[in-house]
């Protein structure tokens, strides 16, 4: 199994909650990632490319396993901070 995902990574839970609300109201995920994410992937609108099991921290991978392609996670906490994840592809 492989996934392709984009994410917005921030250190502040309140900011993550606010960004998730904006995404749910139709704001551009890519634009919010470029503006707010602290991950180097922000230059690609949050795109992390394809990855398989064991390549991401457990909380991130578990969220990807539960998402269907095109859907967005709730705020996911990891050792890196707070993620909003959008699954953009999956290969079973």
Predicted regions and their residues:
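Short beta-strand-initiation
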Residues: 3, 70-71
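Cell-wall glycan
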Residues: 55-69
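Well-structured core secondary-structure elements of compact alpha/beta domains
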Residues: 1-25, 40-56, 85-92
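Acidic-histidine catalytic/liganding microenvironments
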Residues: 26, 36, 67
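Glycine-centered tight-turn and secondary-structure capping sites
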Residues: 25-30, 70
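FKBP-type peptidyl-prolyl cis-trans isomerase
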Residues: 7-12, 29-36, 60, 74-91
């Amino acid at each position: 199994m492989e996934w392709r995902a984009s994410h917005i990574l921030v250190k502040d839970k309140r900011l993550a909650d606010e960004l998730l609300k904006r995404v749910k109201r139709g704001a551009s995920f890519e634009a919010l990632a470029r503006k707010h994410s602290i991950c180097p992937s922000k230059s690609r609108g949050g795109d992390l490319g394809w990855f398989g099991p064991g390549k991401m921290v457990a909380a991130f991978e578990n969220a990807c396993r539960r998402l269907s392609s095109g859907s967005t996670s709730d705020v996911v906490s990891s050792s890196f901070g707070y993620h909003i994840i959008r699954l953009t592809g999956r290969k079973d």
